[in-house]
Regions:
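Short, positively charged and aromatic/hydrophobic N-terminal segments
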Residues: 1-5
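A helix-coil-helix interface module used to build multimeric assemblies
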Residues: 6-241, 245-260, 265
Length: 289
């Protein structure tokens, strides 16, 4: 008879949690730098950042009729919510999502809670020097956005961070190590082959230089990656935007926001950003590997 789980310890109840795969298990020490970029918590922090910056972008630009402009202390408070995102916020977000059953909506609700709490935050005042208006702008949060508007930008930010702060430094270091070995062993003669048969000699340094040259080329391709983003609504048409605020140049608003995040504007999409840039990036990384 095959073995069953009957009578066995329920491993899902063990604390601390058992890793589901080796990246979070035996290789965790090696993969740890990626936690700040590619973990679920890092993704939610990026989502919170996008929601905050979208709110600031709309109010700063005077796009929404009647929406108040935010003071510098109010913007600083909002960005501080992102900077302070940690264990307490992760737990709170998990509790919210247990009710919403929707990850992006949970982030939206968390931000609305922080907006409501701004009235008690020391030093946060409105643009006129009076009480902060943050508790009154909760319904502007996520306005005109579909979840993919938030997600595509958040993934672009987190992937860019992982590539630029973790992968590229490691890749450049490997290339430089190979280049140094190529110089060190430039005169170390060794047998070369053609068609599996002994041929004219080569050196160990030259063969290491071949590898360094190939890898350096892939590094340049990764360095040139365009991290694309869009924020054009549920079908990629700015439909709700134009109906609600027909006088705004929504292409310019969207482009300005995406570029403000340090990403490249994708002007034509469906509901989702096409993700072609991700396929290109992963192909470059695969060739490096």
């Amino acid at each position: 008879q095959p073995a069953t789980m009957s009578g066995m310890v329920d491993l899902s109840a063990v604390s601390p949690a058992i890793a589901l795969g080796p990246l979070d298990g035996r290789y965790r020490a090696v993969a740890a730098p990626l936690v700040n970029h590619l973990s679920e918590a890092a993704l939610n922090r990026a989502r919170l950042q996008v929601e905050v910056e979208w709110l600031i972008h709309l109010t700063d630009g005077g796009v929404l009729p009647g929406a108040p402009r935010l003071s510098e202390t109010e913007k600083s408070y909002l960005r501080g919510v992102v900077e302070d995102f940690g264990a307490e916020e992760i737990a709170e977000l998990g509790a919210i999502e247990a009710e919403t059953r929707h990850d992006v909506k949970a982030v939206e609700y968390l931000l609305k809670r922080r907006l409501a709490a701004a009235a008690q935050a020391p030093g946060v005042v409105g643009a006129d020097g009076g009480p902060t208006v943050l508790p009154t702008v909760g319904e502007i949060v996520h306005i005109f956005c579909t979840s993919e508007d938030i997600n595509n930008l958040s993934y672009a930010l987190t992937i860019r961070g992982a590539v630029e702060q973790v992968w590229l430094p490691a890749a450049r270091g490997l290339v430089e190590d190979l280049a140094a070995m190529a110089h060190e062993h430039a005169d170390a003669a060794m047998l070369a082959r053609t068609h599996g048969q002994p041929a004219t000699p080569t050196t160990l340094g030259k063969e290491m230089a071949v590898l360094a040259h190939r890898l350096r080329r892939q590094v340049r391709r990764v360095e040139a990656t365009e991290y694309l983003g869009k924020i054009n609504g549920a079908t990629g048409t700015f439909g709700a935007h134009v109906v609600s605020v027909p006088g705004a140049d929504w292409q310019a608003v969207g482009r300005g926001f995406v570029e403000h995040l340090g990403l490249t504007w994708n002007p034509l999409t469906t509901q989702i950003e096409s993700h072609d840039w991700q396929a290109e990036l992963y192909s470059d990384v695969a060739r490096f590997n």
